[in-house]
């Protein structure tokens, strides 16, 4: 299983005539950290949608663009009347429905992308959206939306382990089923965009979910909470928690579950993360770790925590998931 992400790299507009608007769209298809380009030839459908009415998606311009395998970028220009007031771009593979197929986890899955809505002749968007369908699969609105930074940077993007772990949580796989009793407490460490915590809160409305990260991630996380509030029951919070420092009093409580995905990319933080886990966990806490192998030093972290944690369950693959408890 390999994930690739269509990423909008640049938007450039010009008014060709008083009534005609042209928008240049430059995009790429890469892995989550941008280190590998999509290796297959493909056709990407680039569409401009009229979003004047919030629930309508009327295509006003479209182009099919050839992507050359292992390429760096591709581009096209869309033309449409300048009279449209709310425009949204969507990019997806030509053989892929822009909503439905984005949620299937198959080999070489390419995730579509949506821009934020914008008005022609105004400031162009610098954020985009990703879509994860919910468990009911009844309609295109049955799902979760996650904001990302436009471009090909590492920060403020969904990473593979979070996408896979969220899909596991939203599925019927009993290994990833949490207790449905009232007021279970779930803590997420290194929440990033919030995909895992929001997925848990949407599936378990009786749970109390606390997402945490450093200060610079909180605003982004809260935007995703706001976007998905209709899928939750006001049962989620976002807070600053710095690993290795004194744990604030509000976190000194029993946690039924602690979850984290793709947090083992920085070896210098391993000792602080382990120290925080030792302080936050008790005998009845289950710890879920989802990660994509990137460095051999991840084995060192796992070896250290297995000195005081028991391995309850392990799922190996491109994304490895561990479930652990205190000895």
UniProtKB/Swiss-Prot annotation:
Its main location: cytoplasm. GO terms for molecular function: protein methyltransferase activity; protein-lysine N-methyltransferase activity. Pfam families: Methyltransf_16. Keywords: Cytoplasm, Nucleus. GO terms for biological process: cytoplasmic translational elongation. It is found in: Cytoplasm; Nucleus. GO terms for cellular component: cytosol; nucleus; protein-containing complex. Gene3D superfamilies: Vaccinia Virus protein VP39. InterPro entries: Methyltransf_16, SAM-dependent_MTases_sf. Belongs to the UPF0665 family. This is UPF0665 family protein C23C4.06c. It comes from Schizosaccharomyces pombe (strain 972 / ATCC 24843).
């Amino acid at each position: 299983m390999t994930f690739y992400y269509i990423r909008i790299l640049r938007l450039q507009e010009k008014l060709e005539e008083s009534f005609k608007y042209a928008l240049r769209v430059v995009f790429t298809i890469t892995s989550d950290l941008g280190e590998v380009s999509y290796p297959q030839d493909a056709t990407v459908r680039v569409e401009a949608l009229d979003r004047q009415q919030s629930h309508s998606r009327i295509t006003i311009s479209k182009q099919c663009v050839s992507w050359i395998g292992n390429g760096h970028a591709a581009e096209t220009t869309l033309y449409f009347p300048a009279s449209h007031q709310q425009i949204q771009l969507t990019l997806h593979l030509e053989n892929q429905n822009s909503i439905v197929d984005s949620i299937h986890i198959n080999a070489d899955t390419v995730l579509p992308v949506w821009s934020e809505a914008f008005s022609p002749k105004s400031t162009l968007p610098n954020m985009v959206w990703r879509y994860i369908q919910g468990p009911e699969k009844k309609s295109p609105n049955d799902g979760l939306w996650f904001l990302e930074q436009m471009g090909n940077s590492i920060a403020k993007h969904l990473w593979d382990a979070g996408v896979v772990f969220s899909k596991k949580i939203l599925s019927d796989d009993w290994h990833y089923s949490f207790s449905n009793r009232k007021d279970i407490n779930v803590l997420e460490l290194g929440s990033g965009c919030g995909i895992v915590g929001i997925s848990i809160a949407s599936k378990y409305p009786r749970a109390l979910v606390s997402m945490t990260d450093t200060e610079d991630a909180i605003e982004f996380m809260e935007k995703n909470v706001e976007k998905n509030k209709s899928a939750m029951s006001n049962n989620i919070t976002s807070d600053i928690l710095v690993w290795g420092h004194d744990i604030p009093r509000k976190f000194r409580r029993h946690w039924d579950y602690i979850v984290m995905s793709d947090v083992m990319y920085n070896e210098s933080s391993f000792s602080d993360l382990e120290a925080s886990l030792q302080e936050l966990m008790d005998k009845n806490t289950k710890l879920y770790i989802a990660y994509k192998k990137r460095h051999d030093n991840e084995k060192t972290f796992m070896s250290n925590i297995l000195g005081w944690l028991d391995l309850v369950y392990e799922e190996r693959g491109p994304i490895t998931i561990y479930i652990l408890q205190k000895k």
